[in-house]
Amino acid sequence: MINVMGEFLRNGKLLTLMLGHLTVDSYVGVIPVLYPLLIGRFHLSLATVGLVSLAYGGTAAISQPLFGLLADRFGTRLTGLALAWTAVTFSVVGFVDSFPLLLTLALASGLGSGAFHPLGALDVRGLLPTWRRSLGMSIYVTAGTVGVAAGPLIGILLFGAYGVHGTGFLVLPGLVTGGYLLWRMRGRAGAVTAAVRHAGMTTPVPVFALAVVIGVMMSRSWTVNVFQAFTPTWYEQLGYGPAFYGPLATTLVLASAVGTVGCGSLADRYGRRTVILATLVLSVPAILLYTVFPGPWAFATAILIGFLAASTAPLMLLMAQQLMASRAGLASGLVMGLGFVTGAVGVPINGAIADAIGLQKSLMTHAVLVIITIGIAWFLPREDEVERYSAQQEALRTSPEQV
């Protein structure tokens, strides 16, 4: 693990991509802290306020396969521009006076996030050594998780001091990091040749294996998004203040960061399928403990949920990239995009359930979802199968991945 982290620190491009991932995902972490302010300002229900996450996450999700295709064809030199766009559009959210306009800005901001994620993941895959790709991708993904974790704390500080207009300050990190990322990645390769594109498009894809990977990713994203989105609102309903639910939301996400790195290391040793199944099984009691026993004990159970629920996303991302090695940009867009859209759609769905039966019971339903997902995950491809598919396509890897 130390050797792989050292590789990130020595490689300026990897380090800059980590910084960009941290920054773009910090905006995701701010959204749940905005919920209480938006509910009061626009007189929204829980289901309606969840549309903000749907607008942001849905646009990011739907657009990712398209941006992945563009990355396979034209390269990834403009990754920093996507980050800057996200920063500018998100920073204006606190200054609009109508909910439809706010949703429009959330859509625009999500478009920038949708561009950044497949481009960044494709860059990182090409820069990492093959022998520790699971851990390396996990470290990169962890940077985004740390950004999500920092988001609630940043939001609490800014909104506590400036109200909803505090979003204006959020333009600064995105513009600075986006500009630096553009400069660092200026030497990346451009468009691929027509012959390579044609070879990649005609290579057969293991559809069933890819569908299973995407299905597990979608389920995990739903659970992660819902718990991160509604923890602040649930605890406000229970009578707790921002000083309690802000750190609790951050604990939930930081635990995800630790779990991501830990599971990446374990996957390199024991295999990704084994690690994914183990985390799914352990997630069921973790969800029940978190929802049945709210209060100060939630900091301990939040660590369990965070560690288990979000930790396997980079493993599934790498699986998809290897299953579609000659179209890794599209693979990144598909697995992350469909995962994003499920998480985004899941927030208003659970919000509607919460309006009917309460937030606590709404969150508890995810124990059932995880049990169903265990059955799906049983059909995940084994390491030798993934490597075989990857080897068949590795010679057709596109030039955007070359350094």
Predicted region positions:
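Central cavity-lining transmembrane alpha-helices of secondary-active solute carriers
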Residues: 54-67, 250-262
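Conserved MFS/SLC helix-loop-helix module at the cytosolic interface between two early adjacent transmembrane helices
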Residues: 62-97
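Cytoplasmic helix-loop-helix junction between adjacent transmembrane helices
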Residues: 105-143
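C-terminal transmembrane helical hairpin of 12-TM major facilitator-type secondary transporters
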Residues: 273-316
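Helix-loop-helix hairpin linking two adjacent transmembrane segments in secondary transporters
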Residues: 139-186
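Helix-to-loop junctions at the C-terminal end of transmembrane segments
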Residues: 63-75, 260-271, 354-355
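Extracytoplasmic gate region of multi-pass secondary transporters
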Residues: 31-32, 209-253, 257
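A late C-terminal transmembrane helix in Major Facilitator Superfamily
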Residues: 326-356
